[in-house]
């Protein structure tokens, strides 16, 4: 299965061009993507206010209209913002939320576990654990992922270290608890060979049928 990390369009004044975004969403779905992930890093969530993020999530859910699953990006340096986005995503019928360790704060492994534990106690949707050292500044180690996978509401792992051995280990050790997603463009084929179930794909924004 292939999910598209959805990019979005802006007017020159910085406002979201919802008409262009609607056209893009429909094109992606008609081209065969199996899911959408709005408000991820590719979607430049950090350029939006909390209210703009909520408004875009509502727009995306309405435009998709149940045709494919939607996982909403809920990344923030502020855990309260992450939880607010996650709770809002649940209220509008999203299928899950993607959550990265707070970027730029360089938490320890114990702090990462405590973060996801707090998340698990305050969400109702399935959580996509996002392991991307390039974005967060920290690598969630296999031992920590093993503990996180046992928490309530943990449903998916997006593995974006760029290390096929890490993804292979995740499949071997976590696939009975989490759905493993490849999060690296250059390793999609290898990831499927090694047992990943899906690919969160940036390239699909411009070439969905070929991705």
Model-based region annotation:
Residues 4, 9-137:
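Active-site beta->alpha loop and helix N-cap motifs at the rims of alpha/beta catalytic domains
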Residues 121-122, 133-211:
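Catalytic alpha/beta core domains of metabolic enzymes, predominantly
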């Amino acid at each position: 299965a292939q999910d598209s990390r959805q990019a979005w369009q802006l007017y020159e004044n910085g406002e979201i061009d919802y008409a262009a975004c609607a056209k893009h969403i429909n094109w992606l779905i008609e081209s065969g993507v199996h899911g959408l992930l709005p408000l991820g890093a590719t979607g430049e969530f950090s350029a939006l206010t909390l209210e703009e993020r909520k408004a875009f999530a509502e727009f995306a859910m309405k435009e998709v209209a149940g045709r494919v699953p939607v996982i909403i990006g809920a990344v923030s340096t502020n855990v309260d913002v992450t939880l607010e986005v996650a709770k809002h995503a649940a209220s509008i019928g999203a299928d899950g939320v993607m959550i990265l360790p707070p970027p730029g704060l360089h938490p320890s492994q114990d702090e990462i576990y405590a973060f996801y534990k707090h998340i698990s106690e305050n969400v109702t949707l399935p959580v996509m654990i996002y392991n991307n050292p390039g974005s967060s500044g920290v690598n969630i180690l296999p031992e920590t992922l093993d503990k996180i996978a046992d928490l309530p509401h943990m449903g998916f792992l997006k593995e974006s270290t760029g290390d096929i051995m890490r993804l292979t280990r995740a499949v071997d050790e976590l696939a009975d608890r989490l759905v493993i997603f490849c999060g690296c463009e250059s390793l999609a084929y290898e990831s499927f060979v090694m047992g990943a179930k899906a690919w969160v794909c940036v390239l699909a924004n411009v070439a969905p049928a070929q991705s």
